[in-house]
Amino acid sequence: MLLVDDHAIVREGLKRVLCPKGSDWALTEAETGFQALELLRTSEFDLALVDLSLPGMNGLELIRRIKTEFPAVRVLVLSMHAEEQYALRAFKAGANGYVTKDMAATELVGAVRRVVAGGAYVTASLAESVVRQLNGSAEAPRHALLTDREFDVLRRIAAGQRLTEIGNALHLSVKTVSSHKTRIQDKLQVAGTAELVAYALRNRIDDAFPEQ
């Protein structure tokens, strides 16, 4: 399996959990999405364990690239980000499972086994949330209407980044970022930056999207 995470201490800890002495699993490490794609092009992997907070190429984009170039590779997201903000976006990108880094080791191993075997892994709380939205007993939040790019811009605005900083980080012009901001405000039905930030804070979006 291929583990994609930019923190060495996290990779080492996961290696001890997933590949103890005598394990049948072998683990190859990558620090960035670009490095992961190069490894996938030169070696065969059954599973990619992908963190969402990756430098240069965020986890969602990496998942899409993997599923486009290597459709047979299973993808399990391993993230510090709350599933209620991010799991559905990961599944829409092509992920086969989503777990958080505070999950118990035995549960993580079980999730890996299920995804490698061809199944999907979702937590009970996420499954319940999806069912409640589908049967109408709970409404999807307004920010569910945002594209991944818009969601990223919203998170950055809420974190205090200026439009020029966002443009530099995402390789976009300030005009394009401003257009994204306008569409976000329309979708969230808020009037300006202050209301936009307040909405993000209420919905825990200020730290929900991975850095890039």
Go through each PLM region and give its residues.
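The feature encodes the CheY-like receiver
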Residues: 10, 55
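Acidic, metal-coordinating helix/loop segments flanking the phosphotransfer/catalytic sites
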Residues: 29-47
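Acidic catalytic/metal-coordinating carboxylates
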Residues: 32, 58-61
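Short amphipathic alpha-helix used as the core "switch/output" element in two-component signaling
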Residues: 38, 60-72
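Active-site residues of response regulator receiver
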Residues: 51, 79
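Short, flexible helix-to-coil linker/hinge segments that flank and couple to helix-turn-helix
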Residues: 85-92, 96-148, 152, 194, ...
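Helix-turn-helix DNA-binding segment
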Residues: 139-175
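Recognition helix of helix-turn-helix DNA-binding domains
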Residues: 162-195
